[in-house]
Amino acid sequence: ELAQAGFTGVWLPPAYKGIDGDRDVGYGVYDLYDLGEFEQKGSVRTKYGTRQQYLRAIAALRAAGLQIYADTVLNHRIGGDAAETARAVPFLQDDRVHPRGESREVEVYTRFTFPGRKGQYSPFEWRWQHFDAVDYDVKTRESGMVYLFDGKQFDDHVSLERGNFAYLMGCDLDFQNEEVRAELLRWGKWYLDTTGVDGFRLDAIKHIAAWFFPNWLDEMTEHAGRELFAAFRATVGSAET
């Protein structure tokens, strides 16, 4: 019916496991490799179903002559499996330029081991070194803060709202880290091979260094051996402006 109505493509929501399991709409990303296959975060399925249901939906759309665009959320991770101790400098959420104190020890949920998946599809595990910043310290439980890890910096070439809007939520990926970039390339190629989607809707691009996605998309296009569609979301300013 969609094709008959003149639609040529469908944008599907984030298909991977979020922190709230089958209640998560997909933007609270926990495990990009779990498309509704593993018992993690209280459920096997995602909000949208199981891996097999997702793949069957893609096949049905393709059979109807429609292209499929996958919502792609690479900016952050949420719902770490264990806490780690690190040192970080505190900033206010609304001011990413002026520190609110000296470097301090923080306890943060930045260790992602994905025990339900047990290394299937990727053995990569996330540690605090793979992130720039977080917004919650178990020790202080303060709200309204951002903690920038020692030796890190907020990404450049991002929105200048709040002085620097690289940090959005959760555990903010460090796109300067070679291991992080390599893992995101590995995931993207796996996702293309697994789903055969025709392109991506890229989330939160104003929070990610502007140089990252052109390089990532070039790699995805080369791997797919065909042109891929790409669109993005970026809200600039406010409703008043």
PLM features: residue spans?
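Active-site-proximal loop/turn and secondary-structure-junction residues that shape catalytic pockets
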Residues: 16, 74-78, 140, 153-155, ...
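Short, acidic/polar
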Residues: 1, 177-194
